[in-house]
Amino acid sequence: MDVIPAIDLLDGRCVRLYQGDYQQSQVYNDNPVEVARQWADQGATYLHLVDLDGAKQGKPVNLASIEAIIRGISIPVQVGGGLRDRASIVQLFNLGVDRAIVGTVAVENPTLVKELCAEFPRKIAVGIDARNGKVATRGWLETSEVIATELAQEMAQLGAAAIIYTDIHRDGTLSGPNREALRELASNIEIPVIASGGISSLTDLLGLLSLEPLGVTGVIVGKALYTGDVDLSEALRAIGPGRWQDVPPDIDSSLFG
């Protein structure tokens, strides 16, 4: 399973939010390139970048930081936040972004998603951010009546490369991932699902391994890396390619100290 470090960009700095609340942001580093290099040096093979200003404004904002990160590391990155038209996505691909993540537009303009998936095969992922099973949009500032599982099925049919599923109530809380929601989602679609939100420990990561056969192929880790609750190199050894071994999902955390 892929372990993907998250770098959230706000005003060009690396921050973390609590449950997506812009008023509860904590700056971890003024230099996101430094952070990206740190994760790459520890063995990351992919990075997840979120343009928080972009998510709010509906267009990419932190382009300079994104470009600097891409130039500063040799591993691919995916980017989400405010990608609501073709021009914004092309702009990112021209910078060297490997994969673009659309969210709001999946709810508001699925036809555009279909066109993008056809034009950029395997390059468009759909971020589904849910509150109580319903999809939130516009930087998590609004909640729609769209059911997350139904949207995932529609996006899979339109050609999305993957679904990145975030449980907003758990994001930035270190309260553990929503395994039941992930199980339901992955069971209903044929494309990969990447889990996001709430990871707090190595035990949480090991607990996701039972979902891998269903199609949960990766996990995005944010706050736990920055607080030190999860050590990236240890996480990669535990659940990444060439991991120690397949571990039962409800392993006693005491085994790992």
UniProtKB/Swiss-Prot annotation:
One Gene Ontology CC term in the entry: cytoplasm
Keyword Isomerase in record: yes
GO molecular function term, any single one: 1-(5-phosphoribosyl)-5-[(5-phosphoribosylamino)methylideneamino]imidazole-4-carboxamide isomerase activity
Stored CDD domains: HisA
Active site residues of this protein: 8, 129
Pathway linked to the protein: Amino-acid biosynthesis; L-histidine biosynthesis; L-histidine from 5-phospho-alpha-D-ribose 1-diphosphate: step 4/9
Principal subcellular localisation of the protein: cytoplasm
UniProt-listed Pfam families: His_biosynth
Keyword Lipid metabolism assigned: no
EC annotation from Swiss-Prot or TrEMBL: 5.3.1.16
UniProt entry keywords in alphabetical sequence: Amino-acid biosynthesis, Cytoplasm, Histidine biosynthesis, Isomerase
One GO BP: L-tryptophan biosynthetic process
Reactions catalysed: 1-(5-phospho-beta-D-ribosyl)-5-[(5-phospho-beta-D-ribosylamino)methylideneamino]imidazole-4-carboxamide = 5-[(5-phospho-1-deoxy-D-ribulos-1-ylimino)methylamino]-1-(5-phospho-beta-D-ribosyl)imidazole-4-carboxamide
Subcellular location: Cytoplasm
Similarity comment: Belongs to the HisA/HisF family.
Protein name (Swiss-Prot/TrEMBL): 1-(5-phosphoribosyl)-5-[(5-phosphoribosylamino)methylideneamino] imidazole-4-carboxamide isomerase
Organism: Rippkaea orientalis (strain PCC 8801 / RF-1)
